Design a protein with these regions (language model features):
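Catalytic core of DAGKc-family lipid kinases
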Residues: 1-58, 63
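Glycine-rich phosphate/diphosphate-binding loops and the adjacent beta-loop-alpha structural elements
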Residues: 67
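ATP/nucleoside-binding phosphotransfer catalytic cores, i.e., glycine-rich phosphate-binding loops
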Residues: 71-141
């Protein structure tokens, strides 16, 4: 711990994403997933590159001021292939997936979607508004 207070410590800025889910604001650092990854009408919102051992945000960086969003709907064969390729981030580009990098976005789900935030919080939502707060905090490593 003393190293973190010394000259060898590195301080890096990290973006915070604020998700407004049906009007309730929930900040997150890493990711938000609506539905099953690569399932029917899924959405992956990435502020970091990885979810577990899957490289779902191959261009995403927690300090670039952008949110990486992948949306789409894959059949079971394409889903298996995309899941396999996501270990190396080579699932993109894909003709059935839309990928974009934005500062803010609003998505609507009908019916409400199951949402998982940073791998922990689970809830349902119909309207999802996202915005990034660049350099919201600093991490010392």
């Amino acid at each position: 711990m003393d190293r973190l207070r010394g000259p060898d410590a590195l301080t890096v800025p990290v973006d915070l994403v604020v998700a407004s889910i049906d009007g309730v604001e929930i900040p997150f650092v890493s990711h938000l997933v609506a539905g099953k990854i690569f399932g029917s009408n899924f959405v992956a919102v990435m502020n970091a590159q990885w979810i577990g051992n899957r490289d779902l945000g191959p261009r995403s960086h927690p300090g670039d001021g952008l949110i990486d969003i992948t949306t789409g709907s894959l059949g079971w064969r394409q889903r298996r292939e995309a899941l396999s390729r996501s270990a190396t981030g080579t699932h993109l580009p894909h003709p059935s997936l839309t990928y974009r990098r934005v500062r803010s976005e609003t998505l609507t789900f009908d019916p409400p979607a199951s949402l998982r935030i940073d791998g922990a919080l689970r809830l349902k939502g119909r309207t999802l508004s996202l915005c990034v707060e660049p350099d919201a905090f600093h991490v010392v490593v």
